[in-house]
Regions:
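Charge-rich, low-complexity N-terminal segments
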Residues: 1-77, 81
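A short, solvent-exposed beta-edge/loop patch
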Residues: 33, 126-192
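Short, solvent-exposed recognition patches
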Residues: 51-150
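Generic ordered-secondary-structure signal
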Residues: 1-5, 17, 33-37, 48, ...
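Functionally constrained cores in energy, signaling, and assembly domains
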Residues: 25, 31, 39, 104-108, ...
């Protein structure tokens, strides 16, 4: 065998070995991808907001509203703030719908105009929505965001002189009405 033929053979072996190594690496990578289990469940766990509301009500003596959610909805967060920095005790619960909608509920006790103005900053009253025996004020962002932010649309219910319920989020108006209806049912239970 001549030196030229041997050099060509060695050059072909290098290319062949490179291709074989690449194929083997891709095969191993594909096997790992297929073998490794993937968790496709929701990473955000459901929260027992009604249990947290019951504890908050027992410890505070306040009438905490924990509405029954429509089918497919669940709570991703709930908390009672008995001594917040702004001085307004409040109950918060976040709700997630079947199409990934989000509606937050803040129920505040002993509010003052400053607290309410802070909650409604960058919003303007655009109308009202009658829900059962209550009329909710609708506030929308003066400069809507794209994508929408959670407080670009809010419904506000003032009741008992200094108590307020706010619902806000990213959902269709009908979703807000459903949650407001569930809140109204709980508020009516309190007055019986």
């Amino acid at each position: 065998m001549s030196e030229d033929a041997a050099a060509k053979r060695r050059a072909r072996q290098t290319v062949n070995n490179l291709v074989l190594a690449l194929i083997a690496s891709l095969g191993i990578m594909l096997a790992i991808i297929l073998i490794v289990p993937r968790d496709d469940s929701n990473r955000i766990q459901s929260v027992d907001y009604q249990g947290i509301a019951a504890e908050a009500q027992a410890s505070s003596g306040k009438q905490i509203v924990a509405p029954e959610l429509p089918a497919g909805w669940w709570s991703n967060s709930a908390r009672w703030s008995p001594k917040p920095a702004d001085g307004v005790q409040n109950w918060y619960a976040g709700f997630v719908g079947p199409k990934n909608q989000y509606i937050g509920l803040t129920q505040a006790f002993g509010i003052n105009p400053t607290w309410l103005a802070f909650q409604l900053k960058n919003s303007a009253k655009t109308g009202t929505q009658a829900v059962g025996n209550y009329t909710w004020d609708i506030y929308e962002a003066t400069e809507p965001s794209d994508p929408p932010k959670t407080k670009d649309f809010m419904m506000v219910l003032n009741y008992n002189d200094h108590d307020t319920a706010l619902i806000y989020g990213v959902a269709k108006p009908q979703d807000f009405v459903e949650i407001a209806t569930a809140i109204q049912v709980k508020l009516m239970e309190r007055t019986k």
